[in-house]
Amino acid sequence: MTDTLPAWERRFRTPSVSLPGWARQAPDRLVYWSTESGVYQVHVADRATGAGRQVTDHPVGVLSGALTLDGEHVLFWQDETGSEAGLWHAQPFDGGEATPYLQGVSQGWNGGLAQAPGVVAAGISDAGGFAVYTSIDGEPASEIRRGSESITVGGLRSGTSGRGGLSADGSLLALDHAEHSDEMHPAVLVIDPRTGATIAEQVDEGMALLSSCWSPAPGDQRLVVSHEREGDERPAIWDLATGEWIDLDLDLRGPVHAVDWWPDASALLVVHNDEGRDRLHRYELGPGSLTAIEHEQGTIGAASVRPDGDVWYRLSRGDHAPVALSASGAEVVRPRGEAAPVGRPFVSWHFDNGEGDRVHGFYVTPEGDGPFPVVMFVHGGPTGQDTDEWDPEVQAYVDMGFAVGMVNYRGSTGYGRAWRDRLIGDIGGPELVDVNAGLSDLVAKGVADSDRAVIGG
């Protein structure tokens, strides 16, 4: 990259890197995906030897990877055409031929992958519906469940893939499914991965449940589940051995997710989202105490606990590109290439929508005084959230002299169940009211020029 390119283009071209995962039995062996080559490809690295390499080289790009438990093979989901339909492939960690990982599984859309000693589980959807396959002791995979409604391996939807599917000893498999409701309000089902028999189920009518992470202790049948019985997402521990359900006592505003356990199963790694900014905590299960983990404000894209108790996380900020860090603040993996030019900071912002609601969002401005021409940049979903997170497109508009307003309108996540579900049966009304109210507020603040306003997203 050359300094002669404008800052906005350099931001788009700066390589990005995911948070590395590691092999459970060989934690020095890492897997991650990066855009060093121009599109996302899977990479591996060995912390013990310093060796590393790019594993995939596919024109469509490869965004999902994992390591086998022993670290001898790297697994990746390859989509040949960009349709997102593909297969899991395996390649030796040190290099060699890539071959389909699970025999007996046809091409489809990725529904998650989980591994435990002696068992592998994979979710696949195709034109015929949604299915779950398991391979026992390396044998060809068998279909153990199929349905017409969404079924995914636990952890996929929670962002904790590899931790929320199979219990540590492989005796239980958690699935998130919509057989009783819909995509927005899934239930959690636990089955025997060898027979497909139902062990237990949790269903909250009109509310969402998602499996997050199993205890790492073999034989421990405690599963962290995310629920929204109090309005905001909250973690609970479901003990499949006893049936006991324990809600975590957390005096925090906004969604809270438990994303991993410490290796001795004494504490949970918790991510708290407070109005579009995340904070990591350690939650001690015995005393029920919460301790903040120090880091800069921003958005935590992923976080996990290393076998030695260190915490790794991926942090993004509106004005700084994402970095993969340890609790000490050191980078755990860094892509080759120049760092992205710093952008302008996101400003947290509230306004009244004229219908009795207080709406939250962020805005960004160029240097100097307004009013500026403005882009009201609307997130998709609608079940999504604008957070204090790096976005080269937003910074490009700011470089061109525009202010950018981002509104977490009714229908967005991050502000409770009722706020998210407000658009059900009423698409095209409340969200437009909120975005327009946000524009009016920015005009009133002197940030935006009402005669030079556009909408995008």
Segments predicted by a language model, with ranges:
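Structural cue for short, hydrophobic secondary-structure segments
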Residues: F377-G380, A396, M406
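Alpha/beta-hydrolase fold nucleophile elbow
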Residues: V447-G457
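Peripheral, non-catalytic segments that deliver or gate enzyme domains
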Residues: T2-G370, P382-M400, G425-I427, L432, ...
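Conserved alpha/beta-hydrolase
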Residues: G401-G416
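Alpha/beta-hydrolase fold active-site loops
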Residues: V359, P373, R452
